[in-house]
Amino acid sequence: MNARMDCRQIVAPLDRGEARIPALVTLPNGRLLLFYDERPAPASGNGSDFNGLTMASDLPNPNRIRWVERTFSAEGDNASRWSTPRDLPLTLPAITSDACVGIDGDGLLHLACASTQGQVGYMDSRTDAEHLQAILAWGSGPEDLQVRDLADELYSRTGADALFATSGSTVTWQGAVLLPYVVRVGNRTHVQVVAVRGGEIQWLSDPLVGPQGVLLDETTLALWDGRLVANCRLQGFEGRGSGARYLAWGDGYSWNGGQLWDCEDPGCNAKQLADFFIHPHSLSSRSAGTVVRLSPPWEGNVHAEAVAALDGGEFGYSDLCVCGDEVVVVFERERGLWEAVVPRCELLP
């Protein structure tokens, strides 16, 4: 273990609600943006506590995606700041959740998110009845976005009863932003990559199905040694998805293989960057944020070496980006969003 990361809160929750589900992206002009869900207190239950009450069951609440920008107060000042929260354009639906963001080969920001016009959530969405919307917004920046609903095309092409793009930042491959969708057909789920560029679907990957009945859930994509790697959370609330993850690799269109990785993981969205992976390193709770370096899954059983750690406290959904000579990590803690910054030289080669 080489690096230790200090952290600070950057987005506080409103009243009894939550600020959660971070997604980081750097625009071609260097602007670093953080998108997140602003959520009211849930009608019942404990929100994002370790009980499964996440987007799957509470999306009909009036969630909305907001954004902040990382800035520096003065020239030569190395102390970063985050702006006050800002709204997305009114062209997007009033209810939005789970931002997945990336930049295409033409420099356009793409933001995929889930929405609903009624009371339907992920679990009761049906292809032939009321179902989740699959919103795609794109443009030069968050102030200027065109919007379309991909639901009709995606539900038709995948046969889904419900689908949503995994939150967080994603990769660009052959000029297209690759959006990792979780697709539910009946009570079975798989992962399918949707490639978009200029607001248009370029292709859909083959379905990625877990081994021996394992159901795959939210997925982080990475480019690693010329391969597209999918690092998948296993489906299951209240710890039933803990103890392992699934890593698959391919060319962006089809999958060449996969490995089930036994690891200390509670079942949580996480972020992979090449062979580095940041996640809550615990079987029983979303805590102990740790950066590990993985062995290539195509070489056999996956092994991990810890290279950096936080303080052992709460660590929920997270995202990571490289910003100049720094690595910026944003994660959920105490119903808000926190930031940790570590010199790039201490973490990445």
What is the predicted role of each segment?
Residues M1-P349:
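Asp-box/BNR beta-propeller blade signature and adjacent active/binding-site loops
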